[in-house]
Curated annotation (Swiss-Prot):
This is Methionyl-tRNA formyltransferase. (6S)-5,6,7,8-tetrahydrofolate binds at residues 112-115. Keywords: Protein biosynthesis, Transferase. InterPro entries: Fmt, Formyl_trans_C, Formyl_trans_C_sf, Formyl_transf_N, Formyl_transf_N_sf, Formyl_transferase-like_C_sf, GART_AS, Met-tRNA-FMT_C. Signal peptide: none annotated. GO terms for cellular component: cytosol. Attaches a formyl group to the free amino group of methionyl-tRNA(fMet). The formyl group appears to play a dual role in the initiator identity of N-formylmethionyl-tRNA by promoting its recognition by IF2 and preventing the misappropriation of this tRNA by the elongation apparatus. The keyword Protease does not apply. The keyword Transferase applies. Its EC number is 2.1.2.9.
Amino acid sequence: MKSLNIIFAGTPDFAARHLQALLNSQHNVIGVYTQPDRPAGRGKKLTASPVKELAIANNIPVFQPGSLRKEPAQQELAALNADIMVVVAYGLILPKVVLDTPRLGCINVHGSILPRWRGAAPIQRALWAGDKETGVTIMQMDVGLDTGDMLLKTYLPIEDNDTSASLYEKLAEQGPIALLQALEGLTNGTLAAEKQDEALANYAEKLSKEEARLDWNKSAKQLWQEVRAFNPWPVSYFEHQGNTIKVWQAHVSETISTAAPGTIISASKKGIEVATADGVLTLLSMQLPGKNPLNVADILNARGEWFSPNTRLANEAE
């Protein structure tokens, strides 16, 4: 297989894993684009992205423009004379002039089965909606938001115990393999581009902390999906006894209850059962303010009086 001269554009750890796969391949990564260094940690020290750190460790030139809309940045990119640009969770918009610069254009690795879940949070939204599968799409980029022609798709079943954290790990393994397959198909002409069906498209909006508040007026199934979707960020939570209590793990109980939504049905080391508008949600792992996440048995040892049966947990509207 012919080797390609590649510009890689990406920022977080998910992207760095794809860069590592390219570095391990026969292709030549001739330049890396990543977001400018950002303040991080308690000291707000300027911190390089995982992609930048990996590029520096491998002596690859790094470019960190604040925008690619200006001509000097575009000329700098064109001067690299790349065959193709690979984009993974970069975070900057690529104008048409940039998309058209490499000989084979720009391709993107997206963490969903397009056209479902275009946008910023596809992994989380698939869980949030109760999807049965997700996957990776390699697409030829155009000026739209994840609207380009699809070159290759992989599929991954979503298990009942999956969270955003676990799906992230699985897709971070699947994505690099799919990327290398797509590059091989592009070079030997075996990939057939497929148009996206706009009728099937929807958008994965960014998550918000407010959205993670548990509303007991929803069904137990929906709340279970939210707990999994919002792990590890922003983490589902409810207010009780003047405290914000995070919920890291839960499942739908087989218990039947006619109690008002938000009422604690039972509390034991097996879990805290809470009535919802439809069904009962069992809380398995929680986090008290200023503490680490704990299983329910340890929570009850510390604050059992907070979770006595028939106690009502406040709803969002109350």
